[in-house]
Amino acid sequence: MGLLDGKSAVVTGAGSGVGRASSLRFAEEGARIVCADIRLEWAKETVRLVERTGGAAVAVQCDVSDEADVIAVIDTAVEQCGRLDIMFNNVGVPTPRLGALLEDHTVEDFDRLAAINLRGVFLGCKHAVIQFKKQGGGGVILNTGSVAGLVGWGGTVYGATKGGVNQITRGVAIECAPFGIRVNAICPAAMPFTNFMAAGGMDAPPEAREEIAAQVGSTHPLGRPITAEDCAEAAVYLVSDRASNITGVLLPVDGGYVAR
């Protein structure tokens, strides 16, 4: 039996990176997945990958900063599976430009980071909790925070939004514990092919990308970059019953970065 047999899961940002890797792992462990992404074609590709391995998934377009979209995604899970068991609020966007300092950010940059990284998690938590309570309690929420929300390392605006995610995680965990609802977060360190590439590195030639990956990995005591698959393994554990007495945890997936 899989760790998530019979479970229904929503994964936001399922079209790439941690969201795609986690969707595949959740499906391998027996969950039925609603793959939500603002880029529908990317979500559909994740569904194809899930189905290729014998899993079950559907794709839904979703802007996590839009409350109606978030409600619709959860409704889809209930319609498809009869209930919601797992809500993985994974969507996040990086700082808009590599190396951007505080004074380099526009108000529009701030608003975009806050809308997606912070409001999106708030909405996902809010409506998952509403659904879990309708079902009589229980259920699991997992958020993607960041070590940037745990320590100061530059990227002030991004770090502020991720610090907010971390505090939402702890607050909702305490509020919802009496209802048997668990809430945790994974806090990855820098992942070169998600954070850095999304902020402009995709324009770099392949050899430069490899150099970026090596540089990022060298900042972690274990000496290698963090991958989407690393995060997916942590996610599977935290949403499974093996973590049934774990809530309010901010789990660094960071190669030892925070411990330095």
Predicted regions and their residues:
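Substrate-binding pocket helix/loop in short-chain dehydrogenase/reductase
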Residues: L98-L102, T106-D111, M202, I212, ...
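Catalytic Tyr-X3-Lys loop
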Residues: E103-F122, L142, V165
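Amphipathic alpha-helical dimer-interface segment in Rossmann-like NAD(P)H-dependent oxidoreductases
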Residues: I116-Q135, A173-I174, P178, S240
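C-terminal substrate-recognition "lid" of short-chain dehydrogenase/reductases
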Residues: F122, L222-V253, V258
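Active-site helix of classical SDR
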Residues: C125, T161, T169
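Residue(s) in the substrate-gating loop at a strand-loop-helix junction
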Residues: S146
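Short, small/polar-rich loop/turn modules that mediate ligand/substrate recognition or access, typified
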Residues: A177, R182, I246-G248
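A glycine/serine/threonine-rich, flexible loop-to-helix segment
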Residues: P178, A190-T219, D230
